[in-house]
């Protein structure tokens, strides 16, 4: 710290909340001390009263900032990010306004906020300004056994056995999906019509409907595979339910709802097959029951969403869609307006054409959707000049409509992607920390005679020597890997010896 005033004054008088005195804004002679802060070679100069506005922060508390004092140069030295300090100093000058410089990444600026100890309120304000979405708190069960089981099934990265369970779960999901797809192949189906009885599989086809009706055989390999998969899904679901910290919140989780949807169709199908009577085929009820079963069995395909529990990519996609619901709603609304307008326009443009492919406005909805989304399926095309002009305008309007909300959705995706990878990057790159070494008393006397520091600074250093040696010794033991080459603190003893 460099004192620019002629007479040193007690810095304690300029700090609000100090046990000896209080800060008086009317006393200008007590607030004219100026300090120099060196940020990796870039010097900033400000007044003590500016820093004293936030006494709980690193720069506002004399005890906290004294460890970074360089008595030889009479300044404070911080080996930190230089562009970020412009915003940090402005935070003090403006009385609490925090704005991130455009050339500073989000994660770096967040680390600077934590380093200078601006507080949780400043961090929350910064996150709100940057559009951060507050992460939901995930409580753990209080019971130790339930906590271990919950971590085992809910957090695959928590341990080796948890990873093994996650791998097994993924394999079972994939087997279930593959089985669901393979059982529809003609090679695995009996296409004899009106065969029923003894649990034999049968299928019915018609000219208007392409499909199959299947009666489950308990010896069928696909049924056995399906049963084994359901056993695992049910076991996994029940274990999660009994180990979860909140039973009520368990059923509000979208992932648990997907688990229920993946399990229920099997038991409904099994119950229907067991309750089916042979005379139902003659009563005309079998067709309806099989149609319902076909819809229920279709729900099995949603098991693929169970993979999102073990895939960060799918989780990021889901979070992006959830955060972009407003933009997606606007997109659908714009498309709806465009479909109505261009369907009506192309219908009236083609009304006089004898071979018109647009017999009504609702029939033109499909063409408008395909054109606005730039798919261009080609099953319905306008033939008149007016219809082609409407089609051209429809395609151009579709491109503009879809392009408007895309940047917002991409921005949300980038945010969630960087937030997911931030933890991994922090684990790989350790932040350089400072070694809090307190100089000895003789060195302090020499440094005080060799350089100009304020009375309050000297008192803080002397107090640290007398009262904090043990605390800093313990901290040094914890940070034994910290060397002089990577420290923010200046070794005063070595500097005076060199001089």
From Swiss-Prot:
Resulting phenotype, residue 90 to A: No effect on channel opening
Name of the featured protein: Potassium voltage-gated channel subfamily A member 2
Annotated GO biological process: action potential; cerebral cortex development; corpus callosum development; neuronal action potential; optic nerve development; optic nerve structural organization; potassium ion export across plasma membrane; potassium ion transmembrane transport
UniProt entry tagged with the keyword Transmembrane helix: yes
UniProt organism field: Rattus norvegicus (Rat)
Modified residues (Phosphotyrosine): 429, 458
InterPro entries (UniProt xref): BTB/POZ_dom, Ion_trans_dom, K_chnl_volt-dep_Kv, K_chnl_volt-dep_Kv1, K_chnl_volt-dep_Kv1.2, SKP1/BTB/POZ_sf, T1-type_BTB, VG_K_chnl
Effect of residue 207 to Q: Loss of glycosylation site
